[in-house]
Amino acid sequence: MLTDMDISSRASLKNITEIGVDLGLLPEEMMLFGHTKAKVELSVLQRLAGQRKGKLIIVTAVTPTPHGEGKTVTSIGLTQSLNAIGQKACACIRQPSMGPVFGVKGGAAGGGYAQVVPMQEMNLHLTGDIHAVSSAHNLGAAAIAARLFHEARLGKTEFEAQSGQAFLDIAPNEIRWHRVVDHNDRCLRQIHVGLGDNNGPEYGSSFDITAASELMAILALSHDLADMRVRIGRLVLALNTQGQVITAEDLGVAGAMTAIMADAIKPTLMQTLNGSPCLIHSGPFANIAHGNSSIIADDIALRLADFVVTEGGFGSDMGFEKFCNIKVRQSGQAPAAAVLVTTLKALKANSGLATEVDSNVSNIHVPKINAANINAPDQARLEAGFANLNWHINNVARYGIPVVVAINRFATDSDAELQWLMEAVNASAAFGCEISDAFSQGEAGAIALAQTVVRAAEIESQFKLLYPDEASLEAKLSTLAEVGYGAAGVSLSIEAKQQAQQLTALGYGHLPLCMAKTPLSISHDPSLKGVPKDFVVPVRELVLHAGAGFITALVGNVMTMPGLGLKPGYLKIDIDAKGEIVGLG
């Protein structure tokens, strides 16, 4: 079979205007970037304000493994197959970060015959949204540092006289807004700024990856440009010496930050290999952010299509949970059904019976099975790993929506093991189970899956949130740990307890929680496979994201700036003699 890159480069593409018109967009509602990409103007929402909305399908997965489960492959394949059976369908997915592209994970355009094309354009830069987020974010960091410098240099009276601005009295050790870059770079996790004469005061700072920026979450959760402007104004950049918040609005930088992102709020339209439309917008990670594409992209697609297929990052304990408790809480758009992706390899890797260590995963040691073992039939490991799939089935079902299991078939899979797995799933709480060959067959490979999803979406949704707004922060943490992960409880550090009290006193206790934890286990510990029990979730820090509208709980050793592994992806990427990019995948 051809590589993903070869398949993409040989694809026969339609002009993106044709894709948009077929979806229901007007030519003037598309801002063209060549023939393959277009920004969608938000004026389409006004034109279609009274339009009946389609059905939203959320794709999630079992606990991820280094072998890849094929969640985006399934999302794109399902969209292609829904269109093939006569349903009007559109995919809505996130923009890939270059950190994982050059790191371990690689691109995020799907794969095989179920991918967004041209895949190299999607995986590198796209229409520049992530760069806009980085620039706007770093403007905020530069602004707070400059304000601190001038206030310290002049003092209150002289500063107000010369600048005409209010003295903010910034506490240097309480600056909360640091800098971002769209790369994995561990040496930037802890830095000092303001060093040298006329550059200070000095204070400790850091870099996060851009996908972890609150601006990325705001981009994903805003309803329109005006809403984004209000949210950016609420950003808490620092505290003053009295412990009061200093916002981007207080600093006077919110308008300029919004201006930088004025085009970034428009989703980008691309196409799949069979010409199905795909809206790509925002890129928050699911382990250190809320892990879902934008409300705006969903809203546009739902007014134009019968079915909209979106996905949450990593397993159902991560992106799906945040889709429900953060995104749906703010959008009001509940899903009609969920698709839960699994593979035989994933279940064996999640069996807890593997012993080999993956040395290429940065910061953590993750048990894995080598390729030779994982491709061989092994009923004992499969049955042990099924417990993980069954947990995820029940986890999705507790939100009141029907769940369809999609088994992403690999060429090496055993027919007997596939049959056993289908029978096991059909005896579970899942609505149905289908084998997907979308990777190898494109639209023809997920017809049965599409038909089952349509039937599942006909059931009246009983969607429910995991916890109410009015619950205390401690109660929300306990619910997420005990119900969301099956933990015995939650443990807050002294700092986290103080932060919970402070955030509640400041009026932020009603916000939902965004748990930043490892995606490689249902628990906080990546070495605990299958369905861990009797563990306590350690919360070390609570971070306010007032603009996005949630509070992040940092769990265990999770980092907001990844590092490159021993064998980074950039080693395979180059330009060939024809000037074409090679090695992406």
UniProtKB/Swiss-Prot annotation:
Catalysed reactions listed for this entry: (6S)-5,6,7,8-tetrahydrofolate + formate + ATP = (6R)-10-formyltetrahydrofolate + ADP + phosphate
InterPro entries linked to this entry: Formate_THF_ligase (IPR000559), Formate_THF_ligase_CS (IPR020628), P-loop_NTPase (IPR027417)
Pfam families named in the record: FTHFS (PF01268)
Pathway the protein takes part in: One-carbon metabolism; tetrahydrofolate interconversion
Enzyme type, top EC level: ligase
Annotated positions binding ATP: 65-72
Domain of life: Bacteria
Enzyme Commission number, as recorded: 6.3.4.3
Entry protein name: Formate--tetrahydrofolate ligase
Origin species: Shewanella baltica (strain OS195)
Gene field: fhs
